[in-house]
Amino acid sequence: WAKADSTNAKMLLGRFSYYFTKAQTTEVVSKPGKKYLGMEPLLTLKDSLGNDVYYYQHNVFDDELYGQAIKAADKAIAHHPDRLDFRFMKANAYIAYEKESPDMALAYLFSLIDEDGKRSQAWSYGDEEAEPDFVEDAMQEYCYSFYSIGSDTSREAFRRISEKLSGIYPSNPEFVNNIGSYYLLKHDYKTALKYYNKVLKKHPGDMTAIQNALLAAKHMKNAKLEKKYQAMMAKNN
């Protein structure tokens, strides 16, 4: 197949899938938290002291085979640079491999965002032309992925990509809400409120901002602010 047409998209996708699948083996590991990489535990048992021990299933990669998968992805991208599905294929491979520390994934998505900003022609996804807002919507999904992984490094990636995207898509409140949620997780409620209020100034009916602002106000034990956001919630329900 490769000899007949070395640029064939299905062949290149098949090569990536072969190496990426072959690189992975499944293991069960114990972790102290009730979530790991955004997953619920596969099994919960008690230790000798009666404490819960949580077991999770995750994939371990063979570095050499994983490297072959990335080379296959790069070749697919080189021959089909307009195909977003190949770009996302590589980003997803980085996320799966890096787990709690998605540094390469973040850097790759930053470069893709920058490239998207310079493009004058439409992307494709598979054999179809991608909608104009496809990248914007997909990036919010990656924000959610970084958030869900739940490590300090992934949450920092969540903040950084959300900040970048909020500057590129100023009319989209989701990315500013993301930044507020980062600070809410850090228990910096004052800073979180700053971002939620920034959203509400432009989008007064945004329920995500209202609900999270109310949560921040409750943590601050600020009754006046609680009443303010409760009134906004009642108005928009």
Regions found by a protein language model. Name each.
Residues 10-14, 85-92, 121-127, 140-141, ...:
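Alpha-solenoid helical repeat scaffolds
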Residues 66, 73, 109, 158-162, ...:
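Hydrophobic/aromatic packing residues within the alpha-helices of TPR/SEL1-like helical repeat arrays
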Residues 18-75, 79, 96-142, 148, ...:
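Short coil/linker segments at helix-helix boundaries
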Residues 69, 105, 155-158, 192, ...:
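Single-residue signature of alpha-solenoid repeat helices
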Residues 19, 94, 146, 183, ...:
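Residue at a conserved register position within TPR or TPR-like alpha-solenoid repeats
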Residues 1, 76, 112, 164-165, ...:
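Canonical positions in the second alpha-helix
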Residues 5-7, 81-82, 117, 169-170, ...:
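Short coil turns that delineate tetratricopeptide repeat
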Residues 128-190, 194, 198:
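Alpha-helical adaptor scaffolds
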